[in-house]
Amino acid sequence: IAAGGFFDGRGLVAALAYGASGVAMGTRFLLTSDSSVPQQVKDYYLTKGVLDTVVSTQVDGVPHRVLRTELVDQLESGTGKVFALPRAALNALRFKRLTGTPLAEMLKEGLAMRKSLDLTWAQMVMAANTPMLLKASLVDGKTESGVMASGQVVGVIDDLPTCADLVHRIIDEASSVLDSLTAK
């Protein structure tokens, strides 16, 4: 399955030509009228361009492409790092409360992640941020205080079709591209 930058039928055909079995379209399907993300968050995404994303390791030590927000810019510049550790600890407790995951299990998972990804202690603790920061934006609608995962394709998406309409559009576009290629 190919992923990264796919949002239409042309991309699907290109990926299939390269040997993929299919494509993942995370940002494209996030931005549909059927998506459970709050409307104000979808509207926020629709205002963003292709240069409004950044690959950041500052949230949890692992590279993620996210929308540039005030919080992300603070983390990237270092001005948000002063409060990162206390915030991560608070978020770990919130995550425990939200999921019922015992702290010992969270610590065990964190230590395994630290070892396998060669993370620092700070990065390991900050990994507790990710679920709560994603929830803040994508569930609670707090675009200013959360982290919003996004592909660069966010800058070329300008509508919120239903998932059914989007799938039909992608199929129609892919068929059109294939027809034009076989006609040559």
Language-model-derived ranges and their functions:
Residues I1-A3:
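Short beta-strand/loop segments at the ligand-binding rim of alpha/beta enzyme cores
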Residues F7-K184:
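Conserved active-site-proximal phosphate/metal-binding subdomains
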